[in-house]
UniProtKB/Swiss-Prot annotation:
Subcellular localization, as worded in the UniProt entry: Cytoplasm
HAMAP family registered for this protein in UniProt: Dps (MF_01441)
Predominant subcellular localization, coarse grouping: cytoplasm
Self-association and partners: Homododecamer. The 12 subunits form a hollow sphere into which the mineral iron core of up to 500 Fe(3+) can be deposited.
Enzyme superclass (EC): oxidoreductase
Catalytic activity: 2 Fe(2+) + H2O2 + 2 H(+) = 2 Fe(3+) + 2 H2O
UniProt family annotation: Belongs to the Dps family.
Source organism of this protein record: Yersinia enterocolitica serotype O:8 / biotype 1B (strain NCTC 13174 / 8081)
PANTHER family: DNA PROTECTION DURING STARVATION PROTEIN (PTHR42932:SF3), GENERAL STRESS PROTEIN 20U (PTHR42932)
Protein name: DNA protection during starvation protein
Gene name, Swiss-Prot/TrEMBL: dps
């Protein structure tokens, strides 16, 4: 079989794949996956912004904690993007798209205290965690639902860690 036949787009704009998930489910799942790609890219960048710029009590503990968060976020991000492609879609993760489509509020760049960063991070982690939980119930592709469930567990744990470090909720 020629390569041209394998990548030829159908009328639906999905890229040909032998994956037998129905086209409607693929389309809806790819949409959800790409929404999560956008959110996880933004959350990853926000996490690094805080990691670089915080100062104050508990700096080193929170600084190192955020490194672990970012690694896990990037692992889930990669899984979501690759799943979109596995289903015949295109992973949409450019800086322009993230800026245009993220539901997260712009992260303040003029804050410095560990506590201020923890609050801002907790707010944004909460938004993404809640979206992922909703996506679990909406998606009809069981493999993607499993991916969302794994991400949800990690995000809930990270949110708990952030909130546990906040002095004043």
């Amino acid at each position: 079989m020629s390569t041209a036949k394998l990548v030829k787009a159908k009328s639906s704009e999905l890229i040909y794949t032998r994956n037998d998930v129905d086209e409607h489910t693929k389309t809806l799942t790819i949409k959800l996956l790409n929404e999560l790609v956008i959110q996880f890219i933004d959350l990853s960048l926000i996490t690094k912004q805080a990691h670089w710029n915080m100062r104050g009590a508990n700096f080193i503990a929170v600084h190192e904690m955020l490194d672990g968060f970012r690694t896990t976020i990037n692992d889930h991000l990669d899984t979501f993007a690759e799943r979109a492609v596995q289903l015949g879609g295109i992973a949409l993760g450019t800086a322009q798209l993230v800026t245009e489509k993220t539901p997260l509020e712009s992260y303040p760049t003029r804050i410095h205290s560990v506590q201020d960063h923890l609050k801002e991070l907790a707010d944004r982690y909460g938004v993404v965690a809640n979206f992922v939980r909703k996506a679990i119930t909406e998606v009809k592709d069981e493999d993607s639902a499993d991916m969302f469930t794994a991400a949800s567990r990690d995000l809930d744990k990270f949110l708990w860690f952030l909130e546990a470090n906040l002095e004043n909720q």
